[in-house]
Regions:
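Hydrophobic beta-strand-centered segment that forms part of the acyl-chain substrate-binding groove
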Residues: 1, 72-112, 139-141, 146
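Short aromatic-glycine motifs in intrinsically disordered, low-complexity regions
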Residues: 1-14
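HotDog/MaoC-like acyl-thioester-processing domains
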Residues: 12, 105-162
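Catalytic strand-loop segment that frames the active site of acyl-thioester-processing enzymes
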Residues: 15-59
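Residues that act as N-cap/strand-start positions at coil-to-secondary-structure junctions
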Residues: 17-18, 93, 112, 125
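A residue-level detector for short acidic-glycine micro-motifs
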Residues: 22-27, 98, 103, 117-119
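Compact, glycine-rich, soluble single-domain proteins
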Residues: 49-75, 93
Length: 162
């Protein structure tokens, strides 16, 4: 099991955007699984009024997908971690196809992300997988493309990261 302190050594994300609490399975070059515990104390719920209906607490689907991507990021970078996006290799999302949100995720749910590396071409990775709450699929990802690029190549001529 990979705990949050170890995840922080691999991913550059920090609060409020570190969206994976634990990696429960990691087979480098093949697959990874991880957990995200959803709570009502997350920043996306700050503006929800006290008298709001349950639908107001649906976890944002874009954040759910980002959480799934964090598990993919751990899978890619585990053997060569670089949490500093200004140096070394930077992790970039290339695109997502066939992603489906199947049902709402609510505070109190524990989301289990499953990521499989479908193909690798050089420093470009193609993933597929799903996320579950209990036995229910809440997200399926047909294809997600991620790539690693030297951070130096991402700087503009003035030396700023773009």
């Amino acid at each position: 099991m990979i705990t949050v302190d170890q995840i922080k050594r691999v991913l550059p994300h920090r609060y409020p955007m570190l969206l994976v609490d634990r990696v429960t399975e990691l087979v480098p070059g093949e697959r990874a699984s991880g957990l995200k515990a959803v709570t009502c104390n997350e920043p996306w719920y700050e503006a929800v009024p006290d008298d709001a209906p349950a639908e107001a607490y649906h976890y944002p689907w874009t954040v759910l997908l980002e959480s799934w991507c964090h598990v993919a990021g751990v899978l890619v970078a585990w053997e060569e971690p670089n949490p500093d996006v200004l140096e070394g290799m930077a992790m970039l999302l290339g695109g997502v196809t066939d992603a489906e949100y199947h049902r709402p995720v609510l505070p109190g749910d524990v989301v289990e992300h499953h990521v499989r590396l479908a193909r690798q071409v050089g420093e470009t990775y193609m993933f597929e997988g799903e996320s579950l709450v209990g036995d229910a699929t809440v997200l399926s990802v047909g294809r997600l493309v991620m790539t690693m690029r030297p951070a130096a190549e991402l700087k503009d001529p003035a030396g700023e990261v773009t």
